[in-house]
Amino acid sequence: MDQNELKKLVGEEAVKFIEDGMTVGLGTGSTVKFMVDALGERVKNENLNIVGVPTSDRTAEQARSLGINVKSVDEVDHIDLTIDGADEISSDFQGIKGGGAAHLFEKIVATNSKKVMWIVDESKMVDHLGAFPLPLEVIPYGSKQVFKKLEKEGLHPEFRKNDAGEYVLTDSKNYVIDLHLGEIKHPHQLADYLIKQVGIVEQGLFLDMVNTVIVGRQNGPEVLTARP
């Protein structure tokens, strides 16, 4: 199976955990897209009654097009389960997210959820975090000063730009700075440092957060329990 087939596999496996009446956080990214497609099929074929809480404009648009009832995080009083992708997951189930520039909204939804599930193909499972650049969402005002400070700290920052050389904007119209770290030895310390920096709205380390991980492997989906 190629990578897309593995992503489709875990997306279809994940929706088996969604029950009638649930409020479900809908993540963002290529793997989640397959999951939302599969959820749309269940809504259509089984008349499944659920509320989806999307973490990006593009996920909201996809969900609505499939007939999924969509509400914002501020319109619901609870979220039973959030299903999202990840860019890296370490052996102790810590994660990096934000490759799709949605990590602020993703973290807001995840931290307000009873349970969090990540769905990934096997290439995302690593021993240590850091090979994937760590995304930061920063407000445009003063962003070059933030950049200079990160550079001075030896964190190898880079503004994320599109093919036209323009700054990539988040749904909140903020910039993204990626840190090219190679390996993150002390993720909790790094997260604490970054979030204290004025101008950084959120950072892409998702720590002590996930309950279940579904990994797409060549021999089928593997369901791992990270935390009760």
UniProtKB/Swiss-Prot annotation:
Keyword terms, alphabetized: Isomerase
CC annotations in GO: cytosol
Record field: catalytic activity: aldehydo-D-ribose 5-phosphate = D-ribulose 5-phosphate
Residue positions binding substrate: 28-31, 84-87, 97-100, 124
GO annotation, biological process: D-ribose metabolic process; pentose-phosphate shunt, non-oxidative branch
EC number: 5.3.1.6
Record's signal peptide: none
Function: Catalyzes the reversible conversion of ribose-5-phosphate to ribulose 5-phosphate.
HAMAP family in UniProt: Rib_5P_isom_A
Assembly behavior: Homodimer.
Similarity remark: Belongs to the ribose 5-phosphate isomerase family.
Protein name in UniProt: Ribose-5-phosphate isomerase A
